[in-house]
Curated annotation (Swiss-Prot):
Family: Belongs to the NAD(P)-dependent epimerase/dehydratase family.
Tissue expression pattern: Expressed in all tissues examined. Detected in most cell types examined, but not observed in endothelial cells, glioma cell lines and some leukemia cell lines.
UniProt keyword annotation of Metal-binding present: no
InterPro entries xrefs: Epimerase_deHydtase, NAD(P)-bd_dom_sf, NAD(P)_epim/dehydratase
One GO CC annotation: mitochondrial inner membrane
Keywords: Mitochondrion, Transit peptide
Subcellular location(s) of the protein: Mitochondrion
Pfam families attached to this UniProt entry: Epimerase
Main location: mitochondrion
Entry-linked Gene3D superfamilies: NAD(P)-binding Rossmann-like Domain
Protein name: Inactive L-threonine 3-dehydrogenase, mitochondrial
Amino acid sequence: MLFIRMLRRAGQSPACGCWTPVLPVRFLGISPRQIPADANFHSASFSDTDHPRVLITGALGQLGVGLANLLRKRFGKDSVILSDIRKPPDHVFHSGPFIYSDILDYKNLREIVVNNRITWLFHYSALLSAFGEANVSLARAVNITGLHNILDVAAEHNLQLFVPSTIGAFGPTSPRNPTPDLCIQRPRTIYGVSKVHAELMGETMQSRFSMMPQSMANSSATWKPARDCP
């Protein structure tokens, strides 16, 4: 599909401090519009008037800057807005629009979407496993309440929404090699639990709002520093 292929190439674009995928991965994507199965990112035609307006939450994590670099090459620097609660390094700040965004502040999220005419939303904000286990209440808030805010604003404003899952959504009792799409998951971390919740919420949004979910699960082993790539 268009966005899955686009995301695979995003990771292939070397960027300072970014990581590059070396294995295929899957995302939870939610869209109120169907995309043709044979759509291709590079063959798709976008005029100046129908360029997507993109917001990336949690953009200072492992994936955001690399994705932004790809999207900005395709749609223009000003069409892609990075957001986070941390101060960006100089090279990120000067590369294109960056704003402060706390996903727990629903009113602020709505204002950002409306004021910037956002049409695509990549939701990367999350507390990962180790930090989440040490801060369970904060992980619940960011990974679950924050997700609900993102889902609500996406439904309200008819956005294309993309949320990554994780290999951590599976547990020790999950079947392996290969792991089927539908199987026992039973994760052992709050991060994994929150991602299972996100996957199930995607299915719920599909049934309630005719959105279209896909799932992507990846692990840290899926990624390696861009400097190590040929």
